[in-house]
Amino acid sequence: MQLRKILRLTDEERRLLARPAFIAGGIFAAILVAVILGIANPLDTVLVLDLRHSHPWTDGMFKILESPGQRRFVYPLAIVLSFVLTYRRRDLLPTITAVSALLFTNAVTGVFKLATLRGFPRRTGDPGVFNTDFGDLADLGAFPSGHATNVAAASTLLVLAAYSARPKFRPLATPITVITAIACFITFVSSWLRDTHWVTDLVAGFALGVCTTIVATLWALHLPDHWRHPELAGRPRIIIFTVGVLSLAAIFMFAANSFLSHSGTSILMVGATLGFIARQSHKGIQRAVARNRDDSAS
């Protein structure tokens, strides 16, 4: 691969990209408070239509339609697409961004599921949190919706990739945005009408997916060139990185949906992710200080 200039964002571009993350994060925080305080419970209860009992034939249909929210489908597809973009752009950024965003999103989602312990509408009529009456964690963990965070994270990655494409592919950005919006809407409606999640679970999930994905993207854009450029990264690092990414794709494709959401794995992943971010940020600060010293000396 020939050396190619690595994409870097200006401070203004980073602020512009961070704005949707702040908005989405604020929406998620507001819904979280409303759910914990029980303010959203009456609304959630009223919006349960119970179609799976009144019209049983709809359950199978909505189960198929909510497939974009299934991690085993959307995550491997996003990872494979990131590999294609990495090869075409001669930059590891697409794959690093996709993997870090999906992992971080999944881990944060799992932590909030474990922290809130909210029951699913299909299994209980009580939308309250901190419900310890269930003996099985599989009956809890409704907030936020994993279906919503999954499709929101993948859609955000697709939209970011579309708008950062080469000029000749830029006209595809609008159709891709429309398609992802439709996929999100179908997932929302299907999960709601199938009683997979409370409505606030779904809205919070979409907000969290957008927020965590953009945060991971901004972090990935700060990585040094030797982490992003295939030639500078070196063959051993490329091999280890490729094996790790393919292993994650296999886990997401074949593991049960509760693999990360209902176990301590989520907490470990968040800790590891934040630790890695802190380590890279510390190195980045050290490099910046060293550059300033060199500039001052010269």
Language-model segments: residues:
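N-terminal transmembrane-helix/juxtamembrane module of multi-pass inner/ER membrane proteins
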Residues: 1-78, 113-135, 284-298
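Multi-pass membrane proteins that catalyze or facilitate reactions on polyprenyl-/lipid-phosphate substrates
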Residues: 1-36, 210-298
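Interfacial segments of alpha-helical transmembrane regions
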Residues: 19-23, 81-108, 173, 177
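Membrane-water interface at transmembrane helix exits
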Residues: 35, 48, 66, 109-117, ...
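Hydrophobic alpha-helical transmembrane segments
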Residues: 69-90, 147-162
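Hydrophobic alpha-helical transmembrane segments of integral membrane proteins
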Residues: 96-124, 183-198
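Alpha-helical transmembrane segments in multi-pass membrane proteins
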Residues: 97-101, 105, 109, 205, ...
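Membrane-embedded catalytic cores of phosphoryl/pyrophosphoryl-handling enzymes
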Residues: 128-266
